[in-house]
Amino acid sequence: MSQSTCPKRRARALPLIGASLMAGSWAAAPSRAVELPPQQLDEVVVTGERPGPGMWHVHRGSAQLWILGSISPLPKGITWRSTQVEQLLGSTSQVLVPKPLEIGIVRILWLLITERQVLMVRGGKRLKDVMPTSLYARFALQRAKFTNDPDKWERYRPIIATAFLQQAAFHQVGLSARLDLGAAVRSLAKKHGVRVQEVKIAGVGDVLDALKTMQPATENTCVEASLVTIESGLPRLMDRAQAWATGNVERIENLPEPAEVDACLAALDSGAASGDLIARVRRTWLESLVKSLQGGGVTLAVVNMDLLLGHSGLLDELRAQGYEVDAPVG
């Protein structure tokens, strides 16, 4: 079956681009930058059961909120040690987790019929026909490094093809976006009979709307920034992943954001019907956290670290509203 008609491959494209544009980093401004070594592609060697970082403790009076920070990608060989969270769940009244960007098989098949033009290059053209020559040359060079197929992803539009390439690069250096901390905590909460509240950050419709109206120049800006990450930013992502696995919050905070974040979030925002998707995500999370504190009791939340940290991150917002924020210990 040809690449352009393979339903399984196209079915993976929507969740993949959603994760690449949204779940990776709803970023606050980057913190202090550190000098990084030249690109080295040694595989991440953190394996086995790892604790991840400690939790932030937000409190005022009797209200308590524990926040577990997540990042993506993570070392593909690790298993998250959930002991601390399981102990906390014994006294927790509710859990806040991101609502997953997932769709059932019927919805996937319908989208493949109705939205194929959103994912693929139109008019029977190929990727090399629609990308600027210099940008395509860089894409092709990286594709040759991480795959054995010189025509791989040629039928996909640039932003989708680059997302696939990025995942291939992650896999080769020992990184994976498959460890879903929110899903893991959701399962633990259900096991312990704790109520789960899902915070919807965006849906498939948001991704489709953004892709439908995204201008080629804006898309190419995101693609170029993503290629920079693949070309020279993998050591930084590997360092962040190792820091998370070993609980080194300070290291994560000091590392700069991936180059693609601002460009790709801007691309998503420019294509979103509301025009303020990024601000809406930040506002939704802040409102959910504050509401949990106002309700009293003990809440556990899983929130992306890039949303938490940095100047005007969610932790700063909570401090500004008069809540005490204790940093993770250890």
Q: Which role fits each region the language model picked out?
A:
Residues A28-A33:
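Sec/Tat signal peptide C-region and signal peptidase I cleavage site
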Residues Q3-I17:
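Bacterial N-terminal signal peptides that target proteins for export
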Residues S25, N248-V249, G297:
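Residue-level recognition of short, well-ordered coil/turn positions
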Residues A267-G330:
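A cross-kingdom marker for long, charged
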